[in-house]
């Protein structure tokens, strides 16, 4: 339809003389069709949470669903940019549990994500950051805040709530929610590169696509995280992830869970959900 034809159709609809438009049989049929499609999509997403599918242990969406299921109600979920925020948007179904969902887009998109999430954990209490490896690398030095968090906790234990001024107590009550030990769990969905670019048409250019677009980094995150004294675990299955994530919820400060996922084939893995 040409823009002019569309505008004329809208004008005729607005000038109708038979009163307000009411939903006819065709309108209801169209709405019902959309509702059926939405319900079918919700069932497919719920099946991911149940570990169904051809390879749930290698699918980013399955781990995002587990975080959404296991995160304490009222806690903060921080979604990094690129595929992380898209996965949260895709797999976060409407439900009874309420989460504080945050995101931050830096000047270059992914810069400052980790430090922002750590800052959010100081205000909202228990926080989970879902991030990819390139975003993590861009702000890796934020893990140095582990020492500062440890010092602050030690000072708080020494001072005790009894020695706080009324203003300090009010601020503490405002910025800390009752969601377990204050801290942040970083869930690294490590596809060793920029898997989001796997959806580009340039994918067919095998001679340069991986080197210039996917940019695999081959970083040893266990060694990198250890340099900052951050507790680390690596999981290869949903069952292992469940155990590691549940355990991290009782750890103050920063804890780190690495989940290896495939670099290529992202378009195919998400085909049933987009």
For the regions a protein language model found, what residue spans apply to each?
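Thiamine diphosphate
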Residues: 90-274
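Glycine-rich, acidic loop regions that bind phosphate or pyrophosphate groups
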Residues: 1-36, 146, 160, 201, ...
């Amino acid at each position: 339809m040409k823009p002019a034809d569309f505008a004329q159709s809208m004008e005729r609809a607005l000038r109708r003389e038979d009163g307000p438009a009411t939903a006819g049989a065709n309108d209801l049929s169209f709405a019902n069709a959309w509702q059926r499609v939405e319900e079918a999509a919700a069932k497919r997403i719920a099946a991911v949470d149940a570990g169904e599918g051809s390879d749930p242990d290698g699918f980013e969406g399955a781990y995002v669903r587990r975080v959404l299921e296991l995160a304490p109600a009222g806690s903060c979920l921080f979604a990094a940019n690129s595929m992380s925020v898209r996965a949260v948007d895709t797999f976060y179904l409407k439900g009874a549990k309420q989460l504080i969902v945050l995101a931050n887009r830096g000047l270059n998109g992914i810069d400052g994500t980790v430090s922002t999430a750590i800052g959010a954990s100081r205000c909202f209490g228990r926080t989970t950051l879902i991030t990819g490896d390139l975003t993590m690398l861009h702000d890796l030095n934020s893990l140095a805040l582990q020492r500062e968090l440890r010092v602050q906790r030690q000072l708080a234990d020494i001072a005790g709530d009894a020695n706080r001024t009324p203003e300090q107590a009010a601020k503490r009550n405002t910025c800390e929610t009752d969601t377990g030990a204050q801290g942040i769990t970083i869930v690294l969905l490590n596809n060793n590169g920029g898997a989001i670019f796997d959806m580009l048409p340039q994918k067919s250019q095998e001679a340069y696509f991986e080197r210039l677009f996917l940019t695999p980094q081959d970083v040893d995150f266990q060694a990198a995280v250890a340099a900052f004294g951050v507790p680390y675990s690596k999981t290869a299955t949903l069952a292992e992830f469940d155990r590691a994530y549940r355990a991290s919820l009782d750890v103050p400060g920063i804890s780190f869970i690495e989940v290896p996922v495939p670099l290529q084939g992202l378009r195919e893995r998400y085909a049933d959900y987009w």
